[in-house]
Swiss-Prot record:
Disulfide bonds join 1-6. This is Conopressin-Tx. Its main location: secreted. It is found in: Secreted. The modification 4-hydroxyproline is found at residue 7. One of its GO terms (cellular component) is extracellular region.
């Protein structure tokens, strides 16, 4: 992921 706290 590209936001705070998401793993991918």
């Amino acid at each position: 992921c590209f936001i705070r706290n998401c793993p991918p």
